[in-house]
């Protein structure tokens, strides 16, 4: 989800974040060549196999390449945040709603068909929340640059999570089907709209899994 963004400034310079988090400014000193203001570090823009590639003079062993929209960090992080927030809200809303109805001694008023759809929707949400939670626990050490925990002894865990992506796909399919069925019931507009949001959140989890290569069939991590 992390990417290096190079920004073009109005005065013709470009800016890029440094390892410290500060922004460094570069001024063009030649064709497709920029030098750091007040320094000697340079960035050179070339093309490799038709892809725009930036070479850093202080890190020549790695390059920066223009990523497609599907791999945009801003897009995918937005999808992840939307999906996680929506699913957590859905997960918390159901017990809270039940408690409020119990306090008011009221019933949901939903028919058997609508209750079955809600049950299926809840099951799909639980599956995806567990799926995201498991991946977060596994990836958390990497976010802290603690790569020592990734050994062959956890290969089975990684493989299990990769295969569990099929459950996330099934949950998304169930969520879309529930939203489609909800639209053809006497449920309130709010309920139907919420079903669509939940379906989009479930699809968002699949999107993140596919783009992030969490749903794969190998142990190259």
Language model features with spans:
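Peripheral terminal and inter-domain segments
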Residues: 1-221
């Amino acid at each position: 989800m992390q990417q290096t963004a190079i920004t073009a400034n109005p005065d013709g310079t470009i800016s890029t974040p440094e390892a410290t988090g500060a922004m460094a400014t570069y001024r063009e000193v030649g064709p497709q060549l920029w030098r750091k203001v007040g320094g000697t570090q340079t960035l050179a823009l070339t093309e490799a196999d038709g892809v725009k590639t930036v070479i850093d003079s202080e890190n020549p062993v790695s390059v920066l390449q223009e990523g497609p929209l599907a791999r945009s960090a801003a897009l995918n992080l937005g999808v992840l945040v939307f999906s996680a927030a929506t699913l957590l809200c859905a997960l918390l809303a159901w017990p809270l709603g039940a408690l409020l109805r119990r306090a008011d001694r009221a019933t949901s008023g939903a028919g058997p068909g609508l209750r079955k759809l809600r049950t299926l929707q809840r099951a799909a949400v639980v599956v995806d929340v567990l799926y995201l939670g498991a991946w977060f626990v596994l990836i958390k050490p990497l976010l802290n640059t603690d790569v020592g925990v990734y050994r062959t002894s956890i290969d089975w865990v990684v493989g299990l999570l990769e295969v569990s992506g099929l459950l996330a796909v099934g949950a998304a399919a169930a969520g879309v089907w529930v939203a489609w069925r909800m639209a053809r019931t006497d449920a309130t507009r709010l309920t139907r709209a919420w079903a669509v949001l939940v379906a989009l959140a479930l699809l968002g989890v699949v999107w993140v899994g596919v783009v992030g290569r969490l749903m794969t069939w190998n142990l190259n991590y």
